[in-house]
């Protein structure tokens, strides 16, 4: 079909010539049956959900258990981000750097254009306008996703400010990021569809200079909801580098002292390391409270007062289900229980509820994430996929900070870097200054999780928890962080801390109880900001003793806390060649400032007896 004969092209609710021309071009290439413009309304959402139920993609859950909620089971080959198929196609290979897959942009466009040709046949091309961050921000970051997946349209309504209001912001000539997505599963006339269409060939491609995203073959979250990692981190990090701000893989937490003073903390952890749990923290120390601003992504800019302000560009939570329960994260459970949730790849109970590993109560019988019968103590496989998800509106979170949607953002007092390490890294360490903090973030390591492909359990370097999400060269990224610090008075900058909730004893036990008790560790960080707490200078930074932490009412072995805080010089000396190897991998663009910090660490460790 030509553009003239594709229904929906001539009834567009916009006069934006660039947008109209792009939609027309994509429609002619992909050959959908029709074009539809998503308006983000409740009526549209309900209509699409009903259609997805009819198609077998969604199963409606028991409204008494999970109101207005649905379960989707993906194709078993389409369950996580596909880092091996994710590309940063900058004009020059050096600008993608050693951590990214690169291909010449012209070559990639050629390959993907061939894949897109006719890829939407038998389907609807949805035009999905969206805004990352508050619509009334001074510089709203806008985008339009073209997709042939109704699952994506429904999820984008939850995860972004999507629809007519975003289209209005784009106006008749506004800039927007072009995000093109196709599941790559055309339907011939009369051909039956499958519940989760996708393609064995997958590409998730970013063109940083032109601010474009092209995704093909996957219907799964991070590969298909292009406002999430693709825009909010990969493209936004390139924008932030050019414009002098930070786009980071961080939660934003509001911690409130008994004196009613608020401290905003941004924290970077690799996927599945407790980011959402910390974002929805329930402090166990009397008088302390916490509220949630965001659980995954923080965009940080300097305010007029010289402080760093953060906004959460997202509109919902796309959380990992396994391990989430009423004990580990009651606020996430309350958010989900409010309804309006799309679950992907969790198990279904016989009474139409959902279940996953770690959730209270083990049902005798389930339908697992592959649609098969699962019997307690008989079935050996997991009922829910380790990377199964819930997609739910942020507005339902009972601990949501009232200012979460403030276009100015919230002033950040502390930045935490943390990963999952069994040894070496203490419970908390304070960086000596901003540049030392950048070094800590640059050397962050974590054990591999199920949220990405790869062998679970091996430690990989994950700088600032951004390894899979950098839109440009990692060395330039480190230098950008150092430069950000030079833009401000050191006294105005957030203090930087390094945390590790996951240290284990020789017998394999966790040394620290974690979860709500982490508020005790954050209290020390806040008291360091206020110059009220002591700490011990060590070769790796300033570390509290057990006496510096508020452990009142905590049933924990004092020796365990001492061990959790211990700086073992031998373990750190063993870490040095691993850091050296990582920096060699980063290559020629490793900043001098980072090399200086590394040399200083080596010297301090050598001086220890």
UniProtKB/Swiss-Prot annotation:
Please provide the record's keywords in A-Z order.
Cytoplasm, Decarboxylase, Gluconeogenesis, GTP-binding, Lyase, Manganese, Metal-binding, Nucleotide-binding
Which annotated residues bind substrate?
Answer: 81, 220-222, 271, 387-389
Which residues are recorded as binding GTP?
272-277, 389, 420, 515-518
Coiled coil located at which positions?
none
Q: Which pathway does the database say it acts in? A: Carbohydrate biosynthesis; gluconeogenesis
From the UniProt record, which GO molecular function terms apply? Answer: GTP binding; manganese ion binding; phosphoenolpyruvate carboxykinase (GTP) activity
GO biological process terms, semicolon-separated: cellular response to glucose stimulus; gluconeogenesis; glycerol biosynthetic process from pyruvate; oxaloacetate metabolic process; propionate catabolic process; response to lipid; response to starvation
Q: What does this protein do?
A: Catalyzes the conversion of oxaloacetate (OAA) to phosphoenolpyruvate (PEP), the rate-limiting step in the metabolic pathway that produces glucose from lactate and other precursors derived from the citric acid cycle.
Q: What is this protein called?
A: Phosphoenolpyruvate carboxykinase [GTP]
The lineage, from the top, is: Bacteria, Bacillati, Actinomycetota, Actinomycetes, Mycobacteriales
């Amino acid at each position: 079909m030509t553009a003239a004969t594709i229904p929906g092209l001539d009834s567009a609710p916009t006069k934006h010539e660039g947008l109209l021309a792009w939609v027309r071009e994509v429609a002619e290439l992909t050959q959908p049956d029709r074009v539809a413009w998503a308006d983000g309304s409740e009526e549209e959402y309900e209509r699409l959900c009903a259609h997805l139920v009819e198609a077998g993609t969604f199963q409606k859950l028991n409204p008494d258990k999970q109101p207005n909620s649905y379960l989707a089971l993906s194709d078993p080959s389409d369950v996580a981000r596909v880092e091996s198929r994710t590309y940063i196609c900058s004009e020059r290979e050096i600008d993608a750097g050693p951590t990214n897959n690169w291909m010449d942009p012209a070559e990639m466009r050629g390959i993907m254009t061939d894949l897109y040709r006719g890829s939407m046949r038998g389907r609807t091309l949805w035009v999905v306008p969206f805004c990352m961050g508050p619509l009334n921000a001074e510089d709203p970051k806008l985008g339009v996703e073209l997709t042939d997946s109704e699952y994506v349209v429904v999820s984008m309504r939850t995860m972004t400010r999507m629809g007519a209001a975003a289209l209005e912001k784009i106006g008749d000539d506004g800039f927007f990021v072009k995000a093109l997505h196709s599941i790559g599963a055309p339907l011939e006339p009369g051909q039956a569809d499958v519940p989760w269409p996708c393609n064995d060939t997958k590409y998730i491609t970013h063109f940083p200079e032109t601010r474009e995203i092209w995704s093909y073959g996957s219907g799964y979250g991070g590969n298909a909801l292009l406002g999430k990692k693709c825009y909010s981190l990969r493209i936004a990090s390139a924008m932030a580098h050019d414009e002098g701000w930070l786009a980071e893989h961080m939660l934003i937490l509001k911690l409130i002292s008994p004196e009613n003073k608020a401290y905003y903390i941004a924290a970077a952890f690799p996927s599945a390391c407790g980011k959402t749990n910390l974002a929805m923290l329930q402090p166990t120390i009397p008088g302390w409270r916490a509220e949630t601003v965001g659980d995954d992504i923080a965009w940080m800019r300097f305010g007029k007062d010289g402080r760093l302000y953060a906004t959460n560009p997202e509109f919902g939570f796309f959380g990992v289900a396994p391990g989430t329960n009423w004990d580990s994260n009651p606020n996430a459970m309350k958010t989900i229980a409010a309804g309006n949730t799309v679950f992907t790849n969790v198990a279904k109970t016989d009474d139409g509820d959902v279940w996953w590993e770690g959730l209270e109560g083990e049902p005798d019988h389930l339908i697992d994430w592959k649609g098969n019968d699962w019997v307690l103590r008989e079935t050996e496989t997991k009922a829910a996929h380790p990377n199964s998800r819930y997609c739910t509106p942020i507005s339902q979170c009972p601990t949501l900070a009232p200012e979460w949607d403030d276009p100015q953002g919230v002033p950040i007092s502390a930045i935490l870097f943390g990963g999952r390490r069994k040894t070496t890294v203490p419970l908390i360490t304070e960086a000596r200054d901003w540049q030392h903090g950048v070094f800590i973030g640059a050397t962050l390591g974590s054990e591999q999780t199920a949220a990405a492909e790869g062998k679970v359990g091996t430690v990989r370097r994950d700088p600032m928890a951004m390894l899979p999400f950098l839109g440009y060269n990692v060395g330039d990224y480190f230098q950008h962080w150092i430069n950000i610090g030079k833009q401000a008075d050191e006294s105005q900058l957030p203090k930087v801390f390094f945390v590790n909730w996951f240290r284990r004893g020789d017998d394999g036990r966790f040394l620290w109880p974690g979860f709500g008790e982490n508020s005790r560790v954050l209290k020390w960080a806040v008291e360091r900001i206020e110059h009220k707490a002591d700490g011990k200078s060590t070769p790796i930074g300033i570390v509290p003793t057990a006496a510096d932490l508020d452990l009142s009412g905590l049933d924990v072995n004092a020796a365990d806390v001492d061990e959790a805080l211990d700086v073992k010089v031998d373990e750190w000396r063993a870490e040095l060649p691993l850091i050296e190897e990582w920096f060699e991998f980063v290559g020629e663009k490793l900043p001098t400032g980072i090399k200086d910090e590394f040399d200083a660490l080596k010297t301090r460790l050598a001086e220890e007896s």
